[in-house]
Design a protein with these regions (language model features):
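N-terminal amphipathic/basic leader segments beginning at the initiator methionine
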Residues: 1-24
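Mg2+-dependent prenyl diphosphate-binding active-site environment of isoprenoid biosynthetic enzymes
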Residues: 16, 23-214
Length: 215
């Protein structure tokens, strides 16, 4: 049993349910988008991001356990992450991810761009339905950060003089922002105080910078 599996064991069943629910949520009635979504969520991966959100949610709400809104937040987190990967693969012209054909390789670039857009739109829709403006602000900031991080990466791709602080800022936008703000959003949904919300944000940010592979 590896470390990630051990870490996520308390929410293993919840993660299985999450993947099934994601496939249902993405099924938009359009056969190509539905096929792309099925392909995306059948490609494996650690599901570490939604797993961390679920673990945090359980830890800060031991009396009530996971609520429907906490579970939906975890689903939104994975939708945003997956949408960003689809777009990244197009920009990077990657043919495979985790040993599986990327969406634009299996279908085409147009379908991949639209599939990524559709996932972002779905995430935004379900985010709005949480009926919590502070959570909406946190996750909307993430989507802005993802776009900003990708732009920074491509503008500085061949800049060997790039400062370490610029590199860290780019990496925060592309990776750490999502889990940091999702952890904080879990706390917002649980109604915890501002000091603990800051601690959740800091935990997500520092944890994500501390692990060797964040893709």
């Amino acid at each position: 049993m590896n470390t990630v599996t051990e870490l996520l064991q308390p929410v293993e069943n919840d993660l299985d349910d999450l993947i099934l629910e994601l496939k249902n949520l993405i099924g938009a009635g359009h056969p190509i988008l539905q096929a792309a979504a099925e392909h995306l969520f059948s490609a494996g991966g650690k599901r570490l991001r939604p797993g961390i959100v679920l673990l945090i949610s359980k830890a800060i709400s031991p009396e009530f356990g996971l609520t429907t809104k906490h579970k939906r937040l975890a689903e939104i987190t994975e939708m945003i992450h997956t949408a960003s990967l689809v777009h990244d693969d197009v920009v990077d012209e990657a043919s495979t991810r985790r040993g599986v054909d990327t969406v634009h390789s299996r279908f085409n670039t147009r379908v991949a761009v639209l599939a990524g857009d559709f996932l972002f739109a779905q995430a935004s829709w379900h985010l709005a339905n949480l009926d919590n403006v502070n959570v909406v602000k946190l996750l909307s900031r993430v989507i802005m950060d993802l776009a900003e991080g990708e732009i920074k990466q491509n503008l500085n791709r061949f800049d060997s003089a790039q400062s370490f602080s610029k590199y860290i800022n780019k990496s925060y936008c592309k990776t750490a922002s999502l889990i940091a703000n999702s952890c904080k959003a879990a706390g917002v949904l649980s109604g915890i105080n501002d000091e603990n919300l800051t601690s959740l944000y800091d935990f997500g940010k520092k944890y994500w910078f501390s692990i060797p592979s964040r893709r």
